[in-house]
């Protein structure tokens, strides 16, 4: 019997690669995205394209407005998205508890459909400032999942996978290309326009562009005219 996996899918480069990895491992993939009040809808449109291209059995977009809380440059217009390169400490683009919220939604869906594997694109190399992208976080969440669910308590354990957590962006891109990922479908920019074109200057754009250079692969990203 084919095993089912829930894959968190933002529409960006990392999550697209993880979806391809889960599929390559033989999982029947269920993609989960969240409309949480992010600055633009382009990444969700990208998520739809990626889910279709990579054969997700289902793709659900859940609405949960984190703009009501703010606390991040991605959900609060009063905070600017940095364009001067990564700095020390936790970046202002960190969305409070976002991975925990999304993994919890994925956990609920997994238990409902009989899946026991959760995949997400945490990366501790390029995004080392995010507390919910560390290996110890992944291990802790897996422990929680097995303490907080009927399936886990009954011994039908959940597994949380973060397959790109120790990979550089260049390594991620090369792995994705080997698995057939079309990165022109993805949007990574924190402030993409309505057409999905990247700003070219935010930290996410900088890291993405450098990743394609490191991978020795042409960058398919569409940039805004001023980028």
Curated annotation (Swiss-Prot):
- What reaction gets catalysed by this protein? 7-carboxy-7-deazaguanine + NH4(+) + ATP = 7-cyano-7-deazaguanine + ADP + phosphate + H2O + H(+)
Q: Give the cofactor note.
A: Binds 1 zinc ion per subunit.
Positions that bind ATP: 9-19
Tell me the superkingdom of the source: Bacteria
- Required cofactor(s): Zn(2+)
Keyword Nucleus set for record = no
- Which pathway is this protein engaged in? Purine metabolism; 7-cyano-7-deazaguanine biosynthesis
Stored CDD domains? QueC-like
Q: Which GO terms describe its biological process?
A: queuosine biosynthetic process
InterPro entries assigned to the protein according to its UniProt record, in alphabetical order:
QueC, Rossmann-like_a/b/a_fold
The answer, when asked if ATP-binding is one of the entry's keywords, is: yes
Q: Which Pfam families match?
A: QueC (PF06508)
Gene Ontology MF annotations: ATP binding; ligase activity, forming carbon-nitrogen bonds; zinc ion binding
Ordered alphabetically, the record's keywords are:
ATP-binding, Ligase, Metal-binding, Nucleotide-binding, Queuosine biosynthesis, Zinc
Q: Which residues bind Zn(2+)?
A: 189, 199, 202, 205
Which Enzyme Commission numbers does its entry carry? 6.3.4.20
Q: Which family does it belong to?
A: Belongs to the QueC family.
Q: What does this protein do?
A: Catalyzes the ATP-dependent conversion of 7-carboxy-7-deazaguanine (CDG) to 7-cyano-7-deazaguanine (preQ(0)).
The protein in question is named: 7-cyano-7-deazaguanine synthase
Q: Which gene codes for it?
A: queC
């Amino acid at each position: 019997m084919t095993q089912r996996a829930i894959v968190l899918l933002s529409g960006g480069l990392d999550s697209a690669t993880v979806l391809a990895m889960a599929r390559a491992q033989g999982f029947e993939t269920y993609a989960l995205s969240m409309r949480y009040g992010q600055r633009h809808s382009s990444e969700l449109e990208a998520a739809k394209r990626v889910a279709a291209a990579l054969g997700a059995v289902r793709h659900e977009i859940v609405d949960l407005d984190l703009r009501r809380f703010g606390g991040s440059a991605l959900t609060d217009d009063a905070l600017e998205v940095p364009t001067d390169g990564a700095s020390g400490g936790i970046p202002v683009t960190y969305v409070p508890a976002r991975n925990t919220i999304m993994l919890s939604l994925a956990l609920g869906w997994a238990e409902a459909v009989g899946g026991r594997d959760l995949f997400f694109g945490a990366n501790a190399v390029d995004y080392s400032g995010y507390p919910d992208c560390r290996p110890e976080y992944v291990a802790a969440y897996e422990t929680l999942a097995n303490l907080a669910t009927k399936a886990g308590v009954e011994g039908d354990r959940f597994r949380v996978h973060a397959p790109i957590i120790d990979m550089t962006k260049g390594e991620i891109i090369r792995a994705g290309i080997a698995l057939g990922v079309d990165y022109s479908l993805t949007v990574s920019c924190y402030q993409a326009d309505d057409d999905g074109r990247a700003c070219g200057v935010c930290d996410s754009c900088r890291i993405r562009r450098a990743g394609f250079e490191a991978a020795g692969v042409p960058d398919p990203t569409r940039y805004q005219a001023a980028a």
